[in-house]
């Protein structure tokens, strides 16, 4: 009879001890982890939260000391954003890691009286803005027969690129042996005195493919700034603008193996044949070097040249794995695994230019990349590659100061997305790495850029 009261007393004691243990465990529950910099600079957080322009959409801003890496401020730093052309910073890093001091223009070997040559993705062959004549003169002066050898290459367009941008200058097709930047340039000259108006087409071989726009293509939907349009699936160009004033337009052309051979032969003004790339053990394969790499990096970053960024990854892929193809995805996988494994968050990396909306990155990851670039590249060289506020590139009309540039960065724009990542020199002399991302805004992009500048000017003045 005594066992039941004793058993009941035991259960009560055990229950009390468990309640005490639970209460103690509850007291020891760790506080939520606060990201570094999240609680700092309340004036800056208030500036962002109170902005009528920025408040309706998703905004991220991250600041860190570029030299020490000290976190200074962070808002939405762990969320994923579409970075647009900020992805070119990843392409730059890939090039810095994989390419030598000069670009690989082409690979070649000689056998008998024939020079066999193959593209490496070098975009500078007679390019309109970063032209190199090294490969052109090498091929033009080579004795004997020229045999161009094809090589497998990534698709003309990257994953997620908008198909209806095929006719705009900023989306040329990718390729193994680019010529003229894969674009045609049109120069309209208005009538002067007794000289009638005229249209100059470069390369000249495209003049015969250019004509007036048919009535069926003259639709109200054509942009008022459009001068020349191209047929979707062929190299037919139609002029839609009058010649009553001077204008210049640039339109991508369709690429193909046969068209490249014909255009290259016309350009070199000598016979050219296609052939397979089959070097023998006794053949010595060499690489012809072209322009210094910084000439490409500078143009790519300053004016945000998508074509150069895409071709940069194709060139970099010649240093990774076998030499049997040019592959954007191969070099992305390699760089991500070998050099970017320590990034705080994984990167969804789809292309070299940022044209694809499949690219996704967190602000904290972009900040880590900026800090890594500053650590590995001498500061004067690094800043010289980027657009500079008030001076050149995509920032030339913003961030002015009579004393000189104080913002160096890479802009990034897609419809409804406006971004900027780079470096900022404060009035105290401190260099900051920053990422300022704006996604899914319906406000005019100019208004968003104005507000970004207003915020960054406060950062410059107060830090």
List each model region and its residues:
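Beta-lactamase-like hydrolase cores
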Residues: 25-80, 99-102, 138-143
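Coil residues (strongly favoring Ser/Thr
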Residues: 50, 102, 113-114, 123, ...
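A small/polar active-site loop signature that marks catalytic segments
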Residues: 214-381
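Small-residue-rich helix-loop
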Residues: 72-74, 288, 313-463
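Active-site SXXK
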Residues: 69, 83-100, 177, 263-268, ...
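Bacterial Sec-dependent N-terminal signal peptides
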Residues: 1-35
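Mid-domain, small-residue-enriched loop/turn segments at the edges of structured enzyme/sensor domains
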Residues: 58, 107-187, 191-197, 272-273, ...
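Short, well-structured active-site flanking segments
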Residues: 97-112, 274, 379-383
